[in-house]
Amino acid sequence: MELLALCWHPLWVPCTLVLSVVLWARRAAWRPAACPVDLRGKTAVVTGANSGIGKCAALELARRNARTILACRSRERGAAAVEEIRRATGNPDVHLRILDTSSMASVRNFARQFLEEEGRLHILVNNAGTTDAMKASAPSRIVNVSSFRHQTGEANVQFLSGKEYPKNVSKAYDSTKLMNVLFTVELARRLQGTGQRTALPSRGVTVNALSPGIVHTEIMKNYSWWVRLLFHLVGILFLKSPTQGSFSTTYCAVSEEVEGISGKYFDSDCRLALPSPLARDPAIGRKLWEASEKLVGLDDGGREPASRKVA
């Protein structure tokens, strides 16, 4: 009874209202509408762009007149997203390419097809394997969608090879997001100097990681109905919509404020933030990178060995 009385204390109502207003005001410190950047003549690739944050980010890039390529696993859902974005933006230069990131054969096929058909890439959201095209198109940006949950992740190289496994699905997610940040920092180090062929050395290929915040996306469909209902009720006040969740992605992809910045982590309010100590450890980053190269069959320069290439 004492607990029930405490929960129904009259101060809970105003405190909850104040907290809700504060959280609502902090949903994003930056709005896409405040950034007038036009991407005409630029090519952008967004993976997982048939729904959620990816689709919202692709829509914003297309709205800015970029040639926007949606890299999706499902042809049907990807085609529907392409048509929706074309109608919403009036930009006919929106296209679908099939990419299943769980299949290295699909990733390699996507990369080869892109290099043959496009050749130039200026914005890459959460993708890999087309770095050469980005170097030739500098200044270019790579945007990796991580999460604030990287703070509790584990940087265990054995997770990559399957020799060991995280304790549960939640820990696996957190560890994956930690590796996103580690790879971002390591890739930024390896891309240093890519701007030397341009007028400004700082305008080469940059790469940054970000957190979209807590977003109500289609990932919730995998949970039971009561969990979905709870998230829906809580989400009215506390969760971001996919559009709001895409703000930090769009910010890192197009904002002039991010020009020349690389190897950094941005929070869901589009502000530079300090990632976890593990995420800032260069030795761990190099170890994870080297282990990943071996697993996907790349050489030390990040290229596929000639013996593996298909004519």
Where do the language-model regions lie?
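Short, positively charged
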Residues: L17, V22, I53, I236-F238
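C-terminal helical subdomain
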Residues: V107, T176, A209, H232-P275, ...
